[in-house]
């Protein structure tokens, strides 16, 4: 019975940490860049887009493909950085959880 109570307390603490981690994910911003910083995309670690910056020198109506490619590259860079931030935040949140050997969190 004592083990069950300890497990319940551990589960409650984990739930609180996960709630806090979700808030941190929503607040953490990452910036992806392309074209030597001429295009920047800012996302939250949850993947929500915050802003896009495009240098005016890239706004050529005759060559929209260049801007399109740079936007995709900057977005991909921001997503990669967001995924890294997400892993770090979630790893911190799960830090106190004692899982059986070989078992991992589902993220």
From Swiss-Prot:
Keywords: Cytoplasm, DNA-binding. Its main location: cytoplasm. Pfam families: YbaB_DNA_bd. The keyword Transmembrane helix does not apply. It is found in: Cytoplasm, Nucleoid. Signal peptide: none annotated. One of its GO terms (molecular function) is DNA binding. GO terms for cellular component: bacterial nucleoid; cytosol. Transmembrane segments: none annotated. Binds to DNA and alters its conformation. May be involved in regulation of gene expression, nucleoid organization and DNA protection. Homodimer. PANTHER family: NUCLEOID-ASSOCIATED PROTEIN YBAB. Belongs to the YbaB/EbfC family. This is Nucleoid-associated protein Mmar10_0436. It comes from Maricaulis maris (strain MCS10). The lineage of its organism: Bacteria, Pseudomonadati, Pseudomonadota, Alphaproteobacteria, Maricaulales.
């Amino acid at each position: 019975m004592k083990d069950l109570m300890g497990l319940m307390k551990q589960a409650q603490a984990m739930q609180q940490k996960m709630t806090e981690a979700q808030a941190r994910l929503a607040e953490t911003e990452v910036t992806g860049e392309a074209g030597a910083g001429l295009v920047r995309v800012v996302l939250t670690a949850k993947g929500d887009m915050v802003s896009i910056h495009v240098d005016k020198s890239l706004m050529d109506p005759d060559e929209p493909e260049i801007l399109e490619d740079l936007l995709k590259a900057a977005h991909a860079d921001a997503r990669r950085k967001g995924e890294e931030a997400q892993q770090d935040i979630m790893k911190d949140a799960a830090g106190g959880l004692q899982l059986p050997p070989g078992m991992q969190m589902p993220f």
